[in-house]
Amino acid sequence: MTVTDLVPVNEDDPGGSNGSQWGRAQVLVKYNTADNPNIVVNEYIANRIAIALGIPTPLGDLWFDPSAGEPAWVVAEIGEPGNHFPPPQEAALRSIPEKTRALMEAFDALIYNTDRHEENILADNDGHAWVVDHDGALFGDIKDDRATGLLSTKDRTDYDPMGFWGNLPATSAARERAIAHIREGKGVIGWASTT
């Protein structure tokens, strides 16, 4: 998360003293649209699942925007303001540890994210990576009753139509461990113990 404009906290402010400071954070704000009325719920649920499973993703939350009259999705920016991660090169993607890649792929299958590509995975050359942009996952752009819409898609199997994970494969053993991790609902500690 990027934080700017630091201001010291006064003795009587919430948060105390001891060198505390107030700051401004850079966030991305997303709203539902007529074409996709599920952006906010898709992002929120996918983010919470990723965090619970220990999958690297920037922290996000709901924000009730009074001017819009409905909740919006806000997510912390990674990097410096105005200096966003470019789409990672293949070398950066391959530097992501195999077990992390396998877990990210299993996560995409779980939430039925058919929109994974190099522009919505942030990666550097040191193996650090974060999955972002899940507005088309889960409920997709279902415009009717979400429960009925989900039932109509229960037999879908191709979560990687763009071939992103096929071009960045993990071994079958790593995939099996990632799938077991997700099925067991383990977080970061559970995954670390299965290496």
Question: What does each model-found stretch correspond to?
Answer:
Residues H128-T195:
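C-terminal catalytic region of ATP-dependent kinase domains
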Residues A52-I55, G82-N83, E98-T100, K154-D158:
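Glycine-rich loops and low-complexity Gly/Arg-rich segments
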Residues M1-F85, F107-N113:
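Conserved ATP-binding subdomain of kinase catalytic cores across diverse folds
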Residues N47-I51, A92-I96, G149-T153:
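Short, low-complexity, polar/charged sequence segments that are solvent-exposed and flexible
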Residues F85-A91:
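AlphaC helix of the protein kinase catalytic domain
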Residues A91-K143:
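Conserved kinase catalytic-core segment
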Residues S67-A68, N113-I121, A170-A174:
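Noncatalytic linker/hinge segments flanking ATPase motor cores
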